[in-house]
Amino acid sequence: MSRAMYCTGDTLITMGHQVDYIFGEYWQLRASVIPKRFTVPLQIPELIYSLAQKGKQYDVVEIHEPLAAPYCFNRKINQNLPPVVLFSHGLEKRNQLAELAYRRQKCLPVSLSLRFLRLTVLQAMYGLQNCDHVICLNSEDNGYLQQIGVDKNRITQVNNGVESQFLLAGEILAPASLSRSGILFLGSWVLRKGTLDLVPAISQVMQHHPSLQFTIAGCGFDADTVLADFAEDIRSRIQIIPKISNNEELIEIYRQHSILVLPSYFEGQPLTMFEAAAMGLAIVTTNICGMADFIENGINGITVSVGDVESLTQSLDHLVENQTLARSLGEAARQKVQAYTWESAGEKIAKAYEKAIQSNKKHLSSKLGLTH
């Protein structure tokens, strides 16, 4: 998420705007026994007040969806606070519903907080209803926002972009794609990323193909922890890379593989998908969220239903056996992703900011009894 914020921020700066990241150099948390995830939302309004007193005035404030409620509440009290744009990288309520459905599908335990009450969801829902504008990343989120009563004129759907480094590396690599093989999973080793389905699927494919290599990168856990989920007879062919430090390292990882697997039950719009597409990998993912907006099944990738281990296994097995098809899907994805630039994303975000500013001006004018 932070990478996306910096990439769009760079674009906005190029367009002539001034952008500050309050989670960076300005952020100073007070000592508290309360977990930071709960104190941060409460401190955002105070931080904006403090910066204003120091002469730092903002035209608009962008806040991540689960953190926006206290700021939106404070704006009702003090309308001199800048208008707020709520940015959702995957709606909290939809994430809750997706996890609940997935756990029931897999007969996993369901906590009371998941079923009835989740503080981040309550904060997010309040923010969505009371912010000046909402930015979301996929058409399913857009539709849900309208379903819960958010005016479509207060919604901007933005696509994530891909950095030029990946596009250039993919262009150079395309003629040599015959030399690539192996399957890559790139992401945190958590339930939401589909690890429960990935383990049996990839295990079966690796049993079918004794020379197949599989990489789990950026997982956030050490090798022993992740490998414990797999049978001993295939562990030697699984490479674990807990952390990735820079784009050069990431590009080298993509370069070594022909297939990306992303079986998440919920996402916003994963950067991994666009980067893999830029590098010409064939993508196997679920038919939901931002993946469904980009992947056309059988044309520039393969999609399967959430939790469908059999289809996931068959799709991966088919691509391993048919590298010509894998290259064809990868090349189609590489061509399509050329249009997904951070410049385009930044322009849409700037327009969303302007809509929030103009909406706030109209609201203040009406409160003062002024006419335009």
Each language-model region and where it sits:
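Short alpha-helical donor nucleotide-sugar binding micro-motif in glycosyltransferases
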Residues: 252-257
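Nucleotide-activated donor-binding/catalytic signature segment of Leloir-type glycosyltransferases, i.e.
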Residues: 225-248
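Short hydrophobic beta-strand element within catalytic cores of glycosyltransferases
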Residues: 282-285
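Acceptor-binding helix/loop patch of EC 2.4 sugar-transfer enzymes
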Residues: 81-122
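Aromatic "clamp/platform" in nucleotide-sugar-dependent glycosyltransferases that forms part
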Residues: 265
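Conserved acidic donor-binding segment of nucleotide-sugar-dependent glycosyltransferases
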Residues: 297-298, 302-309, 318-323
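A short, well-ordered alpha-helix in the C-terminal region of glycosyltransferases
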Residues: 311, 318, 325-339, 348-351
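Carbohydrate-associated surface elements
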Residues: 140, 161
